[in-house]
């Protein structure tokens, strides 16, 4: 068993990866670890070990497995099998640094799979901080300040073209698509939408992207 700092695992890039998590069939009062398998070889081994002990294997996105750990008081650690030769353990406390990102992912994933209305998703996300490529007005404008954003061309259902503001859940995710090395700015989602008066699209390059018109 290895302990690896959560920031070294690159979990954000894998939030929509389908994994297998082992949940107890009976509600437990004593804390236990949540085991996750990401390879078939590890899954086969873990099934033999855990199913006789009353655990059930469930397929779900990694982000939802992380959400389970954060929301449920009876989990202690996350144990990931298949990423390295040894299993990796991450404490619940360390994972909590990802809580806001995981929460946003779960909202976006549910909306992308038609389990949550877009308007409800916006209500849940409007107060969150997102990152966009560009700048807003500052209190004291400096010479050379450029007020701008990186947009994406979209087509409405009636065929009308329009532009949406690209947003991201993390600064690192924004930088990944920032070829021109422009400033990356954090902003409240509702304020950003109001400031530009345009639709916003969050994580447009991922399968769970969401757009608020």
PLM region descriptions:
Residues 1-213:
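An interfacial alpha-helical scaffold signature
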